[in-house]
Curated annotation (Swiss-Prot):
Cross-link (Glycyl lysine isopeptide (Lys-Gly) (interchain with G-Cter in ubiquitin)): 128, 190
Protein name listed in UniProt: Apoptosis regulator BAX
Domain of life: Eukaryota
Alphabetized InterPro entries for the sequence: Bcl-2-like_sf, Bcl-2_BH1-3, Bcl-2_fam, Bcl2-like, Bcl2_BH1_motif_CS, Bcl2_BH2_motif_CS, Bcl2_BH3_motif_CS
Result of altering residue 189 to R: No loss of polyubiquitination
Mutagenesis or variant effect for residue 184 to D/E/H/K: Constitutive cytoplasmic location
Segments passing through the bilayer: 172-192
Motif interval(s): BH1: 98-118
Entry coiled-coil feature ranges: none
Gene3D superfamilies: Blc2-like
């Protein structure tokens, strides 16, 4: 490290500020993409377009492909549809905390967190609670900052996501992410 917060050997930016900035861009883009695929216009999500470098574009594409695969998992969709959003903050933080409760951090779980946040945002759009959208995005980024930032830094920044998902097949990744989220939702329902 040269003190700049970036790894000199191409591992990607690992400063806290850069990880949070990239995380916010990825989350916003992921949620906008999910809303667009649902046919929903989401003016609440429209922000000024931010120029993305090649690495961020690759990360966005990776997240989109995983999201597409997760959308086709009917068991996961059924469980998410059954989530009661009367107290969305409690639901979000309980499910998010449960995903990482065993202390094992990995990119599959980070993607599952983004996917769950996008589903809560889409529920807010469908139920006409647009003020909840920015709030959910804020919760996700707060959780990322408080619980995941150090781990993402240790992985060399967001570029570690591409390395992680570059090795297994998409089907394996999708099954893993869906499993983590399904297990978290099941535990939450039993506790709730």
């Amino acid at each position: 490290m040269d003190g700049s917060g970036e790894q000199p050997r191409g591992g990607g930016p690992t400063s806290s500020e850069q990880i949070m900035k990239t995380g916010a861009l990825l989350l916003q883009g992921f949620i906008q993409d999910r809303a667009g695929r649902m046919g929903g216009e989401a003016p609440e999500l429209a922000l000024d377009p931010v120029p993305q470098d090649a690495s961020t574009k690759k990360l966005s594409e990776c997240l989109k492909r995983i999201g597409d695969e997760l959308d086709s998992n009917m068991e996961l969709q059924r469980m998410i549809a059954a989530v009661d959003t009367d107290s969305p903050r409690e639901v979000f933080f309980r499910v998010a905390a449960d995903m990482f409760s065993d202390g094992n951090f990995n990119w599959g779980r980070v993607v599952a967190l983004f996917y769950f946040a996008s589903k809560l945002v889409l529920k807010a759009l469908c139920t006409k609670v647009p003020e909840l959208i920015r709030t959910i995005m804020g919760w996700t980024l707060d959780f990322l900052r408080e619980r995941l930032l150090g781990w993402i830094q240790d992985q060399g920044g967001w570029d570690g996501l591409l390395s992680y998902f570059g090795t297994p097949t998409w089907q394996t990744v999708t099954i893993f992410v869906a499993g983590v989220l399904t297990a978290s939702l099941t535990i939450w329902k039993k506790m709730g």
